[in-house]
């Protein structure tokens, strides 16, 4: 398994997906910077302690990172089949189940890594203004959010791949998925079942009751179960080709 994960990571050196992800992260930082320091008239919201860190995290989760993660995940899972090298791999032979699981682990690493890169960039800005008042809890918010968003978008990745659709559709689906969060988030306690709202809840972005946290955990578990079923079907389908 470790060899397969390492192999998948080495394949990324030939991929432009990392550049796409970097562009998306830069856009998030630019937009939040403009909003926090230039769009508030006489009041610069970015000067408030931890405003920039929480603004980058919330804007990224609502509009950019789910789409980036979904696009990346769909690309690396269906890359072999769309580039017509899957049949060659099956001649080696390769354990398709382990290969798909290795790809999923790489997606998890990418999701968490993307959030950590975003955190470090935002943290550097905050350090310039509020080094004395920053707390460790904000790092936890980013870390948990990265893990939860991975589980939230994994069903989209698996569904797009299992249906043999173009991986760019996962970007579109994830963006719609993210946009709906704006409206679902106002529905009260029941909104915690929506995966991206659940991600905000579990990371501590929202103040939540034990019942809301429980609903968020259930949401993540359901995402994991649905993804597990799709991954199993995907590995069996590819093994029969």
PLM ranges: what are they?
Residues 26-69, 101-167, 203-207, 211, ...:
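Secretory targeting signals
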Residues 67-81, 157-168, 223-236:
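Transmembrane alpha-helical segments in integral membrane proteins
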Residues 20-25, 164-182:
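Pore- or pathway-lining transmembrane helices of multi-pass membrane proteins that form conduits
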Residues 1-25, 162-165:
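Aromatic- and glycine-rich beta-strand/loop motifs that create alpha-glucan
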Residues 76-108:
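Helix-loop-helix units of permease transmembrane domains in multi-pass membrane transporters
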Residues 77, 86-89, 121, 125, ...:
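Hydrophobic alpha-helical interface/terminus motif in multipass membrane transporters
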Residues 34-53, 171-241:
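Terminal transmembrane helical anchor/hairpin motif
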């Amino acid at each position: 398994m470790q060899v397969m994960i390492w192999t998948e990571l080495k394949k990324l050196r030939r991929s432009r997906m990392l550049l796409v992800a970097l562009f998306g992260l830069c856009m998030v930082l630019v937009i939040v910077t403009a909003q926090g320091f230039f769009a508030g008239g006489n009041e610069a919201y970015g000067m408030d302690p931890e405003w920039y860190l929480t603004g980058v995290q919330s804007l990224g989760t609502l509009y950019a990172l789910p789409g980036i993660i979904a696009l990346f995940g769909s690309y690396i899972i269906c890359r072999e089949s769309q580039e017509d090298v899957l049949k060659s791999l099956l001649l080696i032979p390769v354990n398709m189940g382990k290969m798909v699981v290795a790809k999923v682990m790489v997606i998890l690493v990418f999701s968490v890594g993307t959030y950590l890169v975003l955190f470090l960039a935002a943290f550097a800005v905050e350090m310039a203004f509020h080094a004395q008042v920053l707390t460790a809890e904000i790092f936890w918010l980013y870390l948990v959010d990265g893990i939860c968003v991975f589980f939230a978008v994994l069903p989209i990745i698996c569904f797009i791949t299992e249906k043999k659709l173009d991986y760019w559709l996962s970007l579109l689906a994830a963006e719609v998925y993210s946009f709906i969060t704006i409206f679902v988030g106002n529905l009260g306690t029941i909104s915690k079942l929506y995966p991206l709202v659940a991600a905000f809840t579990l990371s501590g972005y929202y103040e939540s009751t034990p019942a809301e946290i429980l609903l968020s955990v259930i949401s993540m578990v359901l995402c994991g179960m649905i993804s597990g079923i799709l991954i199993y079907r995907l590995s069996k389908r590819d093994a029969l080709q």
